[in-house]
């Protein structure tokens, strides 16, 4: 209470910060007449003047006022739009590297031009990040008019561009693209072998549109570039046939809050029986160590069948299982669940099971965007996640006042006992709104729910149409002109994502009914009366004559204005029945405008606020209401049984709803609990990912340094000497007498790893020889061996071979390291049972693994360079490791490794030996011939070849 009083008296911290920008807003406004008087050429010349001032020592902050005034005037001349004062404040927040929370329709896209232009003057490149290719292309095409007028270049990164096009786009002053494309380009760049092949520049400044969606909703989803492993499709299909035999509760239990599933004792026995019948069980028990892989597959199949629902979590399309974004309802083609879950879903849906993948490179959005020296963001809903954004990204959320007061009415939720009662109430509400020609947007939580609602409308006389189809739209426009409801509706979910922009843009036409999953269509405004841009695109496409086209556009404008007036007047007058003995009935007027109906609450308040925010843009009237049932996920998980009992005691009849602000508050508290839990999960995951991220930065920085150096001979020599030192120290310890030295072991290992025969036994037998002298002689002979290769091939060829082997070996070992870190991560939680901190244990063991990686790198590079031979051109083979030669997982969109291979087609490593398996001598690697990476090592160690002698092959 005291805090509320203080805020009322002194103002909130947000109010004070917004107030602090007013002096600069006034200064920008004062410059407006002067800037407006400039010619186009003079206005354009200001860019060069600003750059010169920066070169002379001024800062970007010094140039903010004149630069913003310049952009405002350029926008007026090119777009016919003038930045409002509140938009200037939004631009300042972005420039300072914080998040501007601006309500729907307040012009976030235009706001970005202010901070983008100012920071682009530094010449380091500015990245504008959007959630999909459509918005990236749209915003780049639209705002490039302002930038090009002022002499700056604009590029756009979308799916399907080749490296030449990408590099050109990144070289521009300003680059638009999606979060996925930026992240994947970063990963692919760090798999390149030449600096000139890398496409991205440094990470200077980025503005993230819909920042909450990218930095919070997608924070737990890593970007992964991967390559296929062995085909195990039959195994997945076999395991899948077991699932129908299991019964919920009796054989497995589900924890919906934690999204986990576990077999019961009876379920384990049933699975063991099925595995024995299929001859897949090794030993006596499912949980014997040799069945670890089988248990993993069982668990993933169980998750696929019990936790993942078709048309809610994923969709089957074109023979593929495509993930659906739980927050936006959009399909995410190319994204695949990891650890065999996606393969389990493919088996469940009887689709072709794709091979499992090995991670080649990965990064989370959390760590990618933290690489930028400065980061800003825009969204309509970030205040509820302000703590997380400040904690993880050091970004403050500043709520920007709206240009006009919000006129939307947010009504209390209506809670029904069953889904059917809820849908009946939604139908009745839609019919009332449709009768008065008020456009309605119904938000659903999944494709499944959107299609249930669509079926419900269809059964009651409504017809589903495509808002992207001109013929269908003409029917809707004709009905609107006549003022009669057409009873037409459109569905926007992952099945119809191609029409997303059209459906959302026309959702404000009188009588339009749109069913949309969550926040699909985010980024496209719903304008009351419809979109001039979309209608002009439809209705003038076949008109060649310019005069006729302009006349048609004028006609459309008049139509839209008339439609807008109809929507604004679509008010509802409701009579409230009086209680017994009270005064006569009262009437309440509910506003017109867009009517938002939520069909259930989401786990996050922010998603609900986003849905509400579709209505009431730029001071327009609007209303929103959520219709809930006790069967809804959130209600069911958070104690609907108690509420159901209470409603029955209160005598709530079928079809009746309960409405009270207390219910809204209770639901918000439940949502806050979920949000807090999800925040803790993301924060904890980040702590683990930071360990890998620190190692990733070291490896990637080293790769770039190696590529920058014309010669890596010195690095290779240091690695060679360090390896020889380690080898000698292992067999000839400092504090031992010569007769205690393992001379035979040293000689054998020098032959096996370095392929050199040295008289180590003779040297060690010399009177008075010390370990240091022995080391010096070995190093000299090894250096002579390498010098002979340089003399044989020439320094140019040797430089190329050294760099090639060093980079490809580093990449190979890094991939193996990622697999080991992943395995460590999966089991480290068990350390908690031993009263040890899993995170500290993970850090310690991850560091040990990293040290081991460096040691293996020295050994492998030295061994390969000592053995490498030039192959004649007609027998050339790619120099890249086998794993790199495969096509990448679809989530990258490109076979980047094929490009990398081509740059090394001039050299290869000679194979040591070619004899068949039957003649392999465990003690003679030269007799092994070609050994598969996943075969047991012929030396008899019991390890896979790739983890044993394969390191040196």
UniProtKB/Swiss-Prot annotation:
EC class of the enzyme, as a word: translocase
Region (Disordered): 873-953
One GO cellular component term noted in the UniProt record for this chain: cytosol
Binding site residues for Zn(2+): 937, 939, 948-949
Cofactor: how and how many bound: May bind 1 zinc ion per subunit.
Basic and acidic residues biased stretches: 914-923
Gene3D superfamilies: Helical scaffold and wing domains of SecA (1.10.3060.10), P-loop containing nucleotide triphosphate hydrolases (3.40.50.300), SecA, preprotein cross-linking domain (3.90.1440.10)
Binding sites annotated in the UniProt record for ATP: 87, 105-109, 525
Keywords, ordered alphabetically: ATP-binding, Cell inner membrane, Cell membrane, Cytoplasm, Membrane, Metal-binding, Nucleotide-binding, Protein transport, Translocase, Translocation, Transport, Zinc
Top-rank lineage group of the source organism: Bacteria
Molecular function as annotated in GO: ATP binding; metal ion binding; protein-exporting ATPase activity
GO BP annotations listed: intracellular protein transmembrane transport; protein import; protein targeting; protein transport by the Sec complex
SUPFAM superfamilies: Helical scaffold and wing domains of SecA, P-loop containing nucleoside triphosphate hydrolases, Pre-protein crosslinking domain of SecA
Pfam family, one: SecA_DEAD
Functional summary from the UniProt entry: Part of the Sec protein translocase complex. Interacts with the SecYEG preprotein conducting channel. Has a central role in coupling the hydrolysis of ATP to the transfer of proteins into and across the cell membrane, serving both as a receptor for the preprotein-SecB complex and as an ATP-driven molecular motor driving the stepwise translocation of polypeptide chains across the membrane.
Subunit-level organization: Monomer and homodimer. Part of the essential Sec protein translocation apparatus which comprises SecA, SecYEG and auxiliary proteins SecDF-YajC and YidC.
Family label: Belongs to the SecA family.
Name of this protein: Protein translocase subunit SecA
Species annotation: Nitrobacter winogradskyi (strain ATCC 25391 / DSM 10237 / CIP 104748 / NCIMB 11846 / Nb-255)
Gene label: secA
């Amino acid at each position: 209470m005291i805090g509320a009083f203080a805020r009322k008296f002194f103002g909130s911290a947000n109010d004070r910060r917004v107030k602090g920008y007013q002096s600069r807003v006034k200064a920008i406004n004062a410059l407006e007449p002067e800037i407006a008087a400039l010619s186009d050429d003079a206005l354009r010349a200001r860019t060069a003047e600003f750059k010169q001032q920066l070169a002379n020592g001024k800062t970007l902050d010094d140039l903010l006022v004149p630069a913003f005034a310049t952009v405002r005037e350029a926008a007026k001349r090119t777009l016919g739009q003038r930045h409002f004062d509140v938009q200037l404040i939004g631009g300042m927040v972005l420039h300072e590297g914080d998040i501007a929370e601006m309500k729907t329709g307040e012009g976030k896209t235009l706001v970005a031009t202010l901070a983008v232009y100012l920071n682009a003057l530094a010449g380091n490149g500015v990245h504008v990040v959007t959630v999909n290719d459509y918005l990236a292309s749209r915003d780049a095409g639209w705002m490039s008019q302002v930038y090009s007028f002022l002499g700056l270049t604009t590029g756009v990164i979308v799916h399907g561009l080749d490296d030449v096009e990408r590099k050109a786009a990144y070289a521009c002053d300003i680059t638009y693209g999606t979060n996925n494309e930026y992240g994947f380009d970063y990963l692919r760049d760090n798999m390149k072998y030449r600096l000139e092949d890398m496409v991205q520049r440094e990470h200077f400044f980025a503005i993230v549109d819909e920042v909450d969606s990218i930095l919070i909703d997608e924070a737990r989803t890593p970007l992964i570039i991967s390559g296929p492993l062995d085909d195990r499709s039959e195994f997945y299909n076999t395991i899948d046939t077991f699932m129908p035999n299991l019964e919920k509760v009796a054989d497995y239990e589900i924890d919906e809050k934690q999204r986990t599933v576990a077999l019961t004792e009876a379920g384990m026995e049933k699975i063991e029986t099925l595995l024995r019948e299929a001859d897949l069980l090794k030993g006596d028990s499912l949980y014997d160590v040799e069945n670890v892989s089988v248990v993993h597959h069982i668990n993933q199949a169980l998750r696929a069948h019990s936790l993942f629902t078709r048309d809610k979590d994923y969709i089957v399309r074109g023979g593929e299982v495509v993930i659906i974004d739980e927050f936006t309802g959009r399909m995410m083609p190319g994204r695949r669940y990891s650890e065999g879950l996606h393969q389990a879903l493919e088996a469940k849906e009887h689709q072709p099971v794709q091979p499992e993948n090995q991670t080649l490179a990965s990064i989370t959005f959390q760590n990618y965007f933290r690489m930028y020296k400065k980061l800003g963001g825009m969204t309509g809903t970030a205040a509820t996640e302000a703590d997380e954004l400040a904690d993880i990204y050091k970004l403050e959320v500043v709520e920007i006042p709206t240009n006009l007061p919000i006129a939307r009415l947010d009504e209390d939720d209506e809670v029904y006992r069953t889904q059917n009662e809820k849908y009946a109430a939604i139908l009745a509400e839609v019919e009332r709104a449709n009768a008065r020609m008020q456009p309605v947007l119904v938000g659903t939580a999944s494709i499944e729910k959107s299609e249930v609602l669509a079926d419900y409308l269809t059964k009651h006389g409504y017809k589903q149409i495509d808002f992207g189809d001109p013929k269908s739209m003409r029917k809707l426009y004709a009905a609107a002109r006549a003022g009669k409801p057409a009873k037409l509706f459109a569905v926007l979910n992952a099945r119809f994502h191609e029409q997303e922009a059209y459906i959302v843009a026309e959702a404000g036409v009188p009588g339009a009914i749109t069913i949309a999953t969550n926040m699909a269509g985010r980024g496209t405004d719903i304008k009351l009366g419809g979109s001039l841009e979309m209608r002009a695109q439809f209705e003038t496409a076949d008109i060649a004559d310019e005069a006729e086209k302009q006349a048609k556009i004028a006609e459309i404008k008049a139509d839209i204005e008339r439609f807008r007036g109809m929507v604004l007047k679509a008010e509802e007058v409701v009579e409230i029945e009086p209680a017994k003995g009270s005064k006569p009935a009262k009437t309440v007027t509910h506003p017109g405008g867009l009517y938002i109906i939520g069909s259930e609450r989401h786990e996050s308040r922010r998603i609900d606020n986003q849905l509400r925010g579709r209505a009431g843009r730029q001071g327009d009237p609007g209303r929103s209401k959520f219709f809930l049932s006790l069967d809804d996920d959130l209600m069911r998980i958070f104690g609907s049984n108690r509420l159901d009992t209470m409603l029955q005691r209160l005598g709530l009849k079928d079809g009746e709803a309960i409405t009270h602000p207390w219910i809204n508050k209770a639901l918000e508290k439940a949502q806050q609990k979920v949000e807090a839990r999800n925040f803790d999960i993301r924060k904890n995951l980040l702590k683990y990912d930071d360990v890998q991220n620190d190692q990733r930065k070291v490896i990637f920085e080293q790769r770039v340094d190696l590529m920058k150096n014309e010669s890596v001979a010195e690095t290779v020599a240091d690695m060679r000497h360090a390896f020889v030192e380690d080898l000698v120290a292992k067999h000839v310890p400092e504090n031992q007498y010569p007769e205690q030295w393992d001379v035979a072991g040293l000689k054998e290992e020098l032959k096996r790893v370095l392929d050199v025969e040295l008289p180590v036994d003779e040297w060690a037998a010399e009177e008075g020889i010390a370990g240091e002298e022995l080391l010096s002689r070995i190093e000299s002979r090894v250096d002579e061996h390498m010098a002979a290769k340089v003399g044989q091939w020439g320094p140019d060829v040797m430089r190329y071979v050294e760099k090639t082997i060093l980079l490809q070996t580093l990449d190979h070992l890094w991939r193996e390291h990622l697999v080991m870190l992943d395995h460590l991560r999966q089991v480290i939680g068990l350390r908690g049972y031993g009263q040890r901190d899993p995170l500290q244990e993970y850090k310690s063991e991850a560091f040990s693994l990293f040290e081991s990686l460096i040691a293996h790198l020295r050994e492998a590079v030295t061994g390969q360079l000592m053995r490498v031979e030039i192959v004649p051109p007609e027998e050339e083979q790619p120099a890249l490791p086998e794993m790199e030669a495969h096509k990448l997982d679809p989530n990258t969109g490109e076979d980047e490794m094929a490009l990398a291979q081509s740059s090394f087609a001039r050299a290869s490593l000679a194979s040591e030996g070619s004899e068949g398996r039957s003649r392999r001598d465990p003690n003679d690697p030269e007799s092994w011939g070609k050994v598969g990476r996943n075969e047991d090592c012929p030396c008899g160690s019991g390890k896979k070849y790739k983890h044993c002698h394969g390191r040196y092959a």
